[in-house]
Amino acid sequence: MVDGDARSELLSADWNGEWMRLQADRRRADDSFEWDKRARHFRPLETAPYARDFMKLLALKPGESVLDMGCGAGSIAIPLAQDGHPVIAADFSPAMLGTLDAGIEYYGLEGRITPLELAWDDDWNLVGPIAKAVDVAFASRSVTTTNLKGALAKLDRTARRRCAVTMVANSSPRYDLHLMNAIGASVTCSNGFVYAFNILIQMGALPQVTYFESPRRDTF
């Protein structure tokens, strides 16, 4: 096969269709009820190294407004608001947003963070932020959707300046690889970032890619 043919097949491949097929084959889809049960464990008491690294890569300008899609309990929304950024913090889990509300009150961030119950698969024209509502829209390890292309397009329509997405490029940070290896358990590595990159190329974007470590750290 010549190089030209290889490039043609790559660019014409139905990356989003393959993503949707993979999501349909998953053993259990992510839903708000699962995250509701985890919410009490997610109250951010400090800015984690991952959040600091991600915020550095965002390279926000002073005072820029942001959409944090899939904000969880506010591990990134809270430090961004503390830095003076107006934040729309959206999540599909009411319990996560309840934990976020507690964090907003604890840190005195009323008026800086606007919680919003919102799922990727919702009709954003009806319940989502308006087009170009914020300077920067991002999703940090939170692209839980059957339609990846649609999700990326929703971020794009919401942002005036730029969008950012982080996706796991190895095993999930939920797992301790040292422990899993020690007990002989297998861990499935994620390749979702490959689909995101190629879908963005097909959408006419020129995505910038950066890899950074996100080591697991347990505290007791």
Regions found by a protein language model. Give the residues of each.
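Conserved class I S-adenosyl-L-methionine
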Residues: 2-59, 63-72
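Conserved SAM-binding loop of SAM-dependent methyltransferases across substrates and taxa
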Residues: 73-85
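Class I SAM-dependent methyltransferase SAM/SAH-binding core
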Residues: 82-123
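A short, conserved alpha-helix within the catalytic core of class I
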Residues: 143-158
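Conserved beta-strand signature within the Rossmann-like core of class I S-adenosyl-L-methionine
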Residues: 160-170
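Short, glycine-/aromatic-enriched active-site segment of Class I SAM-dependent methyltransferases
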Residues: 168-187
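Substrate-binding/catalytic lobe of Class I Rossmann-like enzymes that use SAM or dcSAM, i.e.
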Residues: 188-220
